[in-house]
C-alpha cells in the first residue's frame, strides 16, 4: 500500500522538450489507472473500443482468441479516477483512449510505460518496477488487505482457470494470517 501511495503522491514532471508528455507522467497515470481498474493491461488500454455509462467493455487482448467468451470484461470508471479517464479519452470516439494515436503499437505503448516506471521505481526504491506490478499489487491488496475472496480476485483479473492457479501466482502470500491462525 505504501508504494502505491508513493506513486500517487509523486509530483508530475514538466513537459518534455518536444512539448509532449514525459513518459514518467504517463507511467504514473497508467499505473494508477491499472491499479484502480482491476489490473487492466496496457494492451487493453490501447485497444479498448467502447465506454458507455462510465463502463469500459473490452476483450482482453492477451486471451481473447483462446476463450469462448472472448475474455470480455467490463470495468467501471470509479469517481477517484474519472479525471485520469477524461485526461486520456479519445476525443474522436474511435476508441476509449487516445493511446492508439500516440503510439504505433500497443507494444511501443507498453515500452514507454515501463520506461517511465523504471524511473519511478528508482525514486521509490522498487527495483525493476514494471506495469504488471500494478496488476499484482491490486490482486494482493484485494485478497490480503480487503479480504476479497480469491475466486473474486481471479475474476477481477479476468482469469478463467477454475483451479485459481493463476490468481495464486498474482497474489503475494500473506504469512501474517497463517501466523495468527497458528497462535
Describe every region a protein language model picked out.
Residues 1-42, 46:
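Basic, Lys/Arg- and aromatic-enriched nucleic-acid-binding interface segment
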Residues 50-57, 127-128, 147-169:
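Short, polar N-cap/turn motifs at the start of nucleic acid-interacting alpha helices
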Residues 60-65, 157-183:
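Catalytic-site neighborhood detector that most strongly recognizes the C-terminal catalytic loop/helix
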Residues 32, 36, 40-43, 112, ...:
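C-terminal catalytic core of tyrosine-transesterase DNA break-rejoin enzymes
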Residues 37, 46-86:
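Conserved tyrosine-mediated DNA breakage-rejoining catalytic core shared by Y-recombinases
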Residues 16-21, 61-74, 100-109, 126-130, ...:
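Short, contiguous acidic/charged loop-to-helix segments that flank catalytic cores in large enzymes
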Amino acid at each position: 500500500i505504501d508504494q502505491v501511495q508513493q506513486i500517487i503522491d509523486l509530483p508530475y514532471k514538466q513537459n518534455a522538450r518536444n512539448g509532449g508528455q514525459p513518459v514518467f507522467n504517463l507511467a504514473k497515470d497508467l499505473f494508477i489507472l491499472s491499479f484502480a481498474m482491476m489490473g487492466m493491461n496496457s494492451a487493453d488500454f490501447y485497444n479498448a473500443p467502447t465506454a458507455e455509462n462510465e463502463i469500459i467493455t473490452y476483450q482482453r487482448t492477451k486471451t481473447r482468441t483462446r476463450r469462448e467468451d472472448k475474455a470480455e470484461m467490463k470495468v467501471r470508471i470509479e469517481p477517484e479516477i474519472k479525471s485520469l479517464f477524461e485526461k486520456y479519452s479519445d476525443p474522436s470516439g474511435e476508441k476509449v483512449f487516445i493511446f492508439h494515436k500516440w503510439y504505433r503499437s500497443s507494444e511501443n505503448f507498453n515500452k514507454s510505460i515501463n520506461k517511465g516506471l523504471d524511473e519511478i521505481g528508482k525514486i521509490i526504491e522498487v527495483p525493476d518496477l514494471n506495469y504488471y506490478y500494478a496488476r499484482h499489487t491490486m490482486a494482493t491488496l484485494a485478497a490480503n488487505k480487503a479480504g476479497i475472496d480469491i475466486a473474486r480476485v481471479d475474476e477481477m483479473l479476468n482469469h478463467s482457470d477454475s483451479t485459481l492457479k493463476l490468481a495464486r501466482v498474482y497474489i503475494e502470500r500473506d504469512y501474517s494470517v497463517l501466523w495468527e491462525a497458528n497462535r
